[in-house]
From Swiss-Prot:
Assigned GO CC terms: acrosomal vesicle; proton-transporting two-sector ATPase complex, catalytic domain
Protein name in the entry: V-type proton ATPase subunit E 2
Purpose of the protein: Subunit of the V1 complex of vacuolar(H+)-ATPase (V-ATPase), a multisubunit enzyme composed of a peripheral complex (V1) that hydrolyzes ATP and a membrane integral complex (V0) that translocates protons. V-ATPase is responsible for acidifying and maintaining the pH of intracellular compartments and in some cell types, is targeted to the plasma membrane, where it is responsible for acidifying the extracellular environment.
Keywords per UniProt: Hydrogen ion transport, Ion transport, Transport
Similarity remark: Belongs to the V-ATPase E subunit family.
Entry's Gene Ontology molecular function annotations: proton-transporting ATPase activity, rotational mechanism
InterPro entries assigned to the protein according to its UniProt record, in alphabetical order: ATPase_E_C, ATPase_V1_Esu
Keyword Ion transport appears in the UniProt entry: yes
Quaternary structure and partners: V-ATPase is a heteromultimeric enzyme made up of two complexes: the ATP-hydrolytic V1 complex and the proton translocation V0 complex. The V1 complex consists of three catalytic AB heterodimers that form a heterohexamer, three peripheral stalks each consisting of EG heterodimers, one central rotor including subunits D and F, and the regulatory subunits C and H. The proton translocation complex V0 consists of the proton transport subunit a, a ring of proteolipid subunits c9c'', rotary subunit d, subunits e and f, and the accessory subunits ATP6AP1/Ac45 and ATP6AP2/PRR.
Keyword Ion transport belongs to the record: yes
Listed Pfam families: vATP-synt_E (PF01991)
Length: 226
């Protein structure tokens, strides 16, 4: 039975409505899937960025912490060096004061003569040379000549050797030195410095640990003194 035009139109409309509905459902399905994928991708990107931000700030925090440690270490070292400089300045000041006080020794002729006797004898015993040269300040020549005369028999008694001692009148110690003597071998290759300044310097070096301990107390980081 042939369909009338009206029936054909109805079928066409019905088919078109079905197709449109199916298309709409398909579109909704595509939209839903697209939105789901978008949300998943957005979540992934957000998480990735969050991790990057966390990593960045963790790195920054570590850098800041490292900088703080470096700054603290620098400040501690600066403070330690400042204390060491202050201590060294104090020791230098005390040693300079001691050197100034050495000048008072020579103002006591009797005491200074006894000291020269010992310094000359010590120089002879350290050299153990048959001929020695003694140098002193010009103003000490008389005292040193006397010291030499007393030192020779003592030297001979101790060393069982003879010695010829020449007090140098050509080359002398500077007049502004504190005092004492320098004792040379005859070829002047060996010298014993027994000036008051050199004796003070030697003594201060030998006694520096005790000096530091007396001034600043025992060093907690040092178990023994060298």
């Amino acid at each position: 039975m042939a369909l009338s035009d009206v029936d054909v139109q109805k079928q066409i409309k019905h088919m078109m409505a079905f197709i449109e509905q199916e298309a709409n459902e398909k579109a909704e399905e595509i939209d839903a899937k697209a939105e789901e994928e978008f949300n998943i991708e957005k979540g992934r990107l957000v998480q990735t960025q969050r991790l990057k931000i966390m990593e960045y700030y963790e790195k920054k925090e570590k850098q800041i912490e490292q900088q703080k440690k470096i700054q603290m270490s620098t400040l501690r070292n600066q403070a330690r060096l400042k204390v060491l400089r202050a201590r060294n300045d104090l020791i230098s000041e005390l040693l300079n004061d001691a050197k100034l006080r050495l000048s008072r020794i020579v103002t006591d002729p009797e005491f200074y003569q006894g000291l020269l006797d010992k310094l000359v004898l010590q120089g002879l015993l350290r050299l153990l040379e048959p001929v020695v040269i003694v140098r002193c300040r010009p103003q000490d020549h008389f005292l040193v000549e006397a010291a030499v005369q007393r030192a020779i028999p003592q030297y001979t008694a101790v060393s069982h050797r003879c010695v010829e001692v020449q007090v140098d009148k050509e080359v002398q110690l500077a007049t502004d030195t504190t005092g004492g003597v320098e004792v040379y071998s005859s070829d002047q290759r060996i010298m014993v410095s027994n000036t008051l300044e050199s004796r003070l310097d030697l003594l201060s070096q030998q006694k520096m640990p005790e000096i530091r301990k007396a001034l600043f107390g025992a060093n907690a980081n040092r178990k023994f003194f060298v």
